[in-house]
């Protein structure tokens, strides 16, 4: 996609950066639509379904919402537009559709079908492909993986402020949480409670932003947990709980690969306990920083408040009792817990407001999804 845009000379650097980011997330809807199947089969099983869901997700929960039509149309071809008697909705979307086609034939070692390409895409795209391949050798780069380094170098042109970083983290967190509607508000709740607790602890604004990012990423490892376990309508078996526990280590490993060590530790070690009985590493005492303690307590509170198919959320009195018992057993920080209890109503009210806003957008998105499927099916 990047090389095709370069040789077309139709796009500014800023546009290319944003469209490339969108392209990376082009199948984000498949994560929801085909969550119980192999995601690689999404293009075959439900191409329009996951394109529509992905587009609405980007529109509602992404800092790149202006580019949502690129995702919406990334399976549209000239033949599709002709059959549906529609004008081209998004030129970058059609180019992404062509890029997706190239990727599929390269992965499967197929030969390009020139007649098929001419039927489905503007003839200009073949010229762009040949020129880009000649200049940048992207066919071989796709095969041997060198394209990753090229993309990373290109993205060095991208400036992202703290607010945008938080927005991207929210997008990633929502993509994971929306797999299961039982857990859809959990991450927002953890972020909101963490922010309020950090303020009460007189943490600097810069560190509060860091804590919010970590709270948003705290369950990133659940991307590897089977949906059947995440949505199980009852208590997990010992074996299932061991699988669920693995999300901490998976998240730790993911963020380690990104060289985000402080974010990694605050985000993914929220199941560690002060007495060393937690997981995945059995840290204890001073090995668990203030920021880690804040996210850990926020995660516990969110879990206690949250309703699931098999349980109602606990009452204020029950939650306070459980937290105090954990303090006595040296599981969680005494001072942070006391701050929460003393400010319970305010903190929970702020968290509930954050959740209500997100859930309203999510509900509207689901309704629009059904409407758009009728239009584009």
Where are these regions (language model features)?
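Histidine- and acidic-residue-rich, metal-dependent catalytic cores
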Residues: 1-377
């Amino acid at each position: 996609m990047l090389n095709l845009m370069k040789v077309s000379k139709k796009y500014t650097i800023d546009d290319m950066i944003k469209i490339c980011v969108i392209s990376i997330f082009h199948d984000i809807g498949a994560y929801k639509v085909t969550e119980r199947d192999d995601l690689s089969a999404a293009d075959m099983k439900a191409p329009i379904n996951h394109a529509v869901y992905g587009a609405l997700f980007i529109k509602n929960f992404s800092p790149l919402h202006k580019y949502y039509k690129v995702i919406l149309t990334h399976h549209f071809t000239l033949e599709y537009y002709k059959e549906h008697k529609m004008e081209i909705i998004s030129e970058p979307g059609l180019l992404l559709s062509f890029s997706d086609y190239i990727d599929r034939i390269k992965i499967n070692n197929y030969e390009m079908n020139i007649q098929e390409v001419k039927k489905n895409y503007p003839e200009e795209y073949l010229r762009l492909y040949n020129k880009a391949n000649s200049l940048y050798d992207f066919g071989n780069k796709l095969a041997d993986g060198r394209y990753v380094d090229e993309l990373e170098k290109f993205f060095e042109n991208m400036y992202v402020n703290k607010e945008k970083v938080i927005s991207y983290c929210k997008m990633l967190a929502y993509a994971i949480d929306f797999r299961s509607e039982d857990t859809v508000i959990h991450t927002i709740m953890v972020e909101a409670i963490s922010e309020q607790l950090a303020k009460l602890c007189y943490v600097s604004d810069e560190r509060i932003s860091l804590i919010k990012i970590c709270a948003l990423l705290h369950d990133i490892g659940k991307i590897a947990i089977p949906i059947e376990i995440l949505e199980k309508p009852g208590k997990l078996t010992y074996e299932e709980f061991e699988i669920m526990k693995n999300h901490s280590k998976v998240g730790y490993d993911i963020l380690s690969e990104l060289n985000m060590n402080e974010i990694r530790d605050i985000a993914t070690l929220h199941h560690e306990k002060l007495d060393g009985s937690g997981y995945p590493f059995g840290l204890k005492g001073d090995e668990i920083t203030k920021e880690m303690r804040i996210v850990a307590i926020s995660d516990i509170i969110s879990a206690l408040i949250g309703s699931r198919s098999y349980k109602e959320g606990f009452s204020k009195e029950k939650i306070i009792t459980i937290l105090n018992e954990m303090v006595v057993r040296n599981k969680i920080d005494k001072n942070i817990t006391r701050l929460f209890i003393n400010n319970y109503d305010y903190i929970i009210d702020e968290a509930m407001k954050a959740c209500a806003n997100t859930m309203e957008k999510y509900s509207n998105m689901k309704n629009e999804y059904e409407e758009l499927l009728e239009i584009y099916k």
